Amino acid sequence: MLSVICPIYNEEKYIAKCIDSILAQDYPKDDLEVIFVDGMSTDRTREIVAEYTAKYPFIRLIDNPERIVPPAMNKGILASKGDIIMRLDAHSTYASNYFSVLVKALYDLGADNVGAVCKT
């Protein structure tokens, strides 16, 4: 399973586009979980993510009262079920093959870590 972790805080302007690009991924949804770790947003970020979590069971929202990225990643990793961890940024959108290309590269190269350049 691929566990995608996305730390978020006050992302209401960007989060829907980010999630829509996640939903457009060609990666199998039955082998995917997406965990948004929210730093207690004060805008509509949580409401927007909640609309998606209600429709898509592989998307979750957890809290990060510490409000900074390192604890958000740690909380996301602890909550994850996958054997592969991927980090995303909420300000970005992702090509529909982004997940599958990175996972394939990880296995093909026998690498411990792979990354990509994204346009934000």
Question: Locations of the language-model features?
Answer:
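N-proximal low-complexity "stem/linker" segments adjacent to membrane-targeting elements
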Residues: M1-S21
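Acidic helix N-cap motif at the loop->helix transition within catalytic regions
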Residues: Y14-A16, D43-E51, N97
